[in-house]
């Protein structure tokens, strides 16, 4: 017996019984993004490894532990399956000069890859939708992005299950001053740090505060706060952002320990969090990355964006029973006898041209078997064609979901008959 193959651990198939749920969510996202003036960009799944090391940060979990990296056997280049979408999008912006006399607002959707321990809401292949708004330095675009995500939750019916947490990371100089104070603080508490904390203490001290280790929580809570090191300009930006969010009627929680796991963030950062999914509670996160475009070879320009975990949002929608029932076809065509198959095929094309979704039985099967399939398909109507109907130029119309007598009508009256029955 031939070997059976299985999907790679942590990388899941989306079967037809679930794919309609993805389509529903994707359609809602596309409508939202169009309403806010965002344009789609599609970048390769594979990028050169140095792009991610430069943008995400060398001393981050993603770069150190989670990237799927391999060597191109043809030229020896180090390549990586994208672990997030911002770096590749900005690489494309710089490469194709999209910032020339423009402030692009871009969105992407697709699979990302991280070598993590698979669990509910955390996978090795996962899907993100993300946005990047470029060339806009004020807090107004930061507020609009929050408004857009809040709008999505409202449209999906999950506003009551999510909360917004925000913080400001300041600029490079302010973070440097805070970093110096934080390292000094951590050095005084080095005896209680775990091995990961000791390793990061001098390379990425902010991430030490983002610990999930309960034994370190008290130490982290008492650490110097970045908010105490914000200068006038960063503080004004943060206060302006908060004022706009409040004016839009969006509730938020200030979280001084919200630092995000990617090194490119500065000033505004945020997370949308839910308590309904256990440990994997963050469903959308992002922030400002002024300076990153310049680091990737472009001109100096501001930027802000977010990434949304699509699987996690779908899990929340499923948990709350907010996904629609699977869409069924409008018409199932049953055919019996010589010539009925071709007759039905022509009729099916006419129906599809008029906007109906149609499944035609193909191959040999009894009338009883075909009617059973018609009922199981979820179709609203069965159209029945046999040799007698072909000779008379007629079709039998049977309603499958309503107590209506079946009727035999002329073939050219089928569309009008269906329209009447659906009214």
Curated annotation (Swiss-Prot):
Keywords: Aminoacyl-tRNA synthetase, ATP-binding, Cytoplasm, Ligase, Nucleotide-binding, Protein biosynthesis. SUPFAM superfamilies: Class II aaRS ABD-related (SSF52954), Class II aaRS and biotin synthetases (SSF55681). It catalyses: tRNA(His) + L-histidine + ATP = L-histidyl-tRNA(His) + AMP + diphosphate + H(+). It is found in: Cytoplasm. It is an enzyme of class 6 (ligase). One of its GO terms (biological process) is histidyl-tRNA aminoacylation. It holds the Pfam family HGTP_anticodon. It comes from the Bacteria. One of its GO terms (cellular component) is cytoplasm. Its main location: cytoplasm. Its EC number is 6.1.1.21. GO terms for molecular function: ATP binding; histidine-tRNA ligase activity. HAMAP family: His_tRNA_synth (MF_00127). Belongs to the class-II aminoacyl-tRNA synthetase family. Homodimer. This is Histidine--tRNA ligase. It comes from Chromobacterium violaceum (strain ATCC 12472 / DSM 30191 / JCM 1249 / CCUG 213 / NBRC 12614 / NCIMB 9131 / NCTC 9757 / MK).
């Amino acid at each position: 017996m031939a070997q059976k193959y299985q999907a790679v651990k942590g990388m899941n198939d989306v079967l037809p019984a679930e794919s309609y749920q993805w389509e529903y969510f994707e359609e809602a996202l596309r409508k939202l993004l169009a309403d806010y003036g965002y344009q789609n960009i599609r970048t390769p799944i594979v990028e050169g490894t140095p792009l991610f090391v430069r943008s995400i940060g060398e001393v981050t979990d993603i770069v150190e532990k989670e990237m799927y990296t391999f060597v191109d056997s043809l030229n020896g280049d180090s390549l990586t399956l994208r672990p997030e979408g911002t770096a590749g999008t900005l690489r494309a912006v710089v490469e194709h000069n999209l910032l020339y006399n423009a402030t692009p607002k871009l969105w992407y959707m697709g699979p990302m890859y991280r070598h993590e321990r698979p669990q509910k809401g955390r996978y090795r292949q996962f899907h993100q939708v993300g946005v990047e708004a470029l060339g806009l330095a004020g807090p107004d675009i930061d507020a609009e992005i929050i408004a857009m995500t809040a709008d999505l939750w409202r449209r999906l019916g999950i506003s009551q299950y999510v909360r917004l947490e925000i913080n400001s990371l300041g600029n490079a100089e302010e973070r440097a001053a805070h970093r110096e104070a934080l390292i000094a603080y951590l050095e005084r508490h080095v005896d209680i740090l775990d091995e990961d904390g000791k390793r990061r203490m001098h390379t990425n001290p902010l991430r030490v505060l983002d610990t999930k280790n309960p034994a370190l929580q008290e130490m982290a809570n008492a650490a110097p706060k970045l908010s105490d090191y914000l200068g006038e300009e960063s503080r004004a930006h943060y206060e302006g952002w908060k004022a706009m969010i409040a004016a839009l009627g969006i509730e938020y929680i200030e979280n001084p320990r919200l630092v995000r796991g990617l090194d490119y963030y500065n000033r505004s950062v945020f997370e949308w969090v839910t308590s309904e999914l256990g440990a994997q509670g963050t469903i959308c996160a992002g922030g400002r990355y002024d300076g990153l475009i310049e680091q990737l070879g472009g001109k100096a320009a501001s930027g802000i964006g977010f990434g949304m975990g699509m699987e996690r949002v779908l899990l929340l929608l499923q948990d709350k029973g907010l996904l629609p029932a699977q869409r069924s076809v409008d018409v199932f065509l049953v055919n019996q006898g010589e010539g009925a198959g071709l007759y039905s095929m022509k009729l099916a094309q006419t129906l599809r041209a008029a906007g109906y979704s149609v499944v035609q039985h193909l191959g040999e099967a009894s009338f009883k078997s075909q009617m059973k399939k018609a009922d199981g398909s979820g179709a609203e109507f069965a159209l029945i064609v046999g040799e007698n109907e072909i000779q008379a130029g007629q079709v039998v119309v049977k309603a499958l979901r309503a107590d209506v007598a079946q009727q035999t009508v002329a073939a050219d009256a089928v569309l009008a008959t269906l329209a009447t029955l659906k009214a």
